[in-house]
Amino acid sequence: FLFSPVGLAGLVLLAIVVFGCAYTVDQTEQVVITQFGRPVGSPINAVDSASGAGLHFKIPFVQTANSFDKRILEWDGQPSEMTTRDKLYVVVDTFGRWRIADPLRYFQSLRDERSALSRLDDIIGSETRNVIARHDLIEVVRSDKDRTPEQDAILAESGGTIGVLPPIRIGRHRLEDQILAAASPKVGIWGIELLDVKIKRLNYKQGVIEKIYDRMKS
């Protein structure tokens, strides 16, 4: 009977059902189960989930396993021209690290990484612009809070005769912390945890460097 057409068809149908029921969750992913497009149950292998990675089962043809990355992910912003408090223009290039902390909320609001990166572009870009606008260029350039004036490499390389900058009050690292603090709650509503934001690169136009020299001479 097993080798008859009916028996073979039954075996094929059974295999389809079994494979449709079982699925494996990797250590690097977390899963939200949906039934007819709506989430059911708790996320699997999430940070605060009771169920972990391994073999799991769902109702075939009715439920779908939606997988999301559990690892730390990177965000790389586009260089953007911004204005400092002292009305100088600088091109700021930022990057950050983030992760999906609440896969259910992430699924309900964003669904995929492309949408998440687009939202991160908007929020981090906006908060970076706000922070830069509240501080003078010297605070963006310098990355330490040393009270002793020191040579700034970028200005020195520009060929100017004056490269000694005044001491700073805050410094770039504190500005990065301010960007992170402002952006974190805004992306948190989408189930995203923003781990850090860093200023990767700063570019000045020649006119900006000349203005810095003029101010330091005066």
Model-predicted segments: where are they?
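Single-pass alpha-helical transmembrane signal-anchor segments
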Residues: L2-A22
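Generic signal for short, ordered secondary-structure residues
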Residues: S4, L11-V12, E74-W75, P103, ...
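Long, charge-rich amphipathic alpha-helical coiled-coil "stalk/tentacle" segments
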Residues: K198-S218
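Amphipathic, coiled-coil-like alpha-helical scaffolding segments used for oligomerization/assembly
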Residues: T84-K87, V91-D93, R97-R99, A116-K205
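Short low-complexity stretches enriched in small and charged residues
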Residues: L8, V47-H56, P149-I154
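N-terminal start-of-chain detector that recognizes signal peptides
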Residues: L2-V6, V62-R71, P166-R172
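Hydrophobic membrane-anchoring helix/hairpin
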Residues: F19-A133
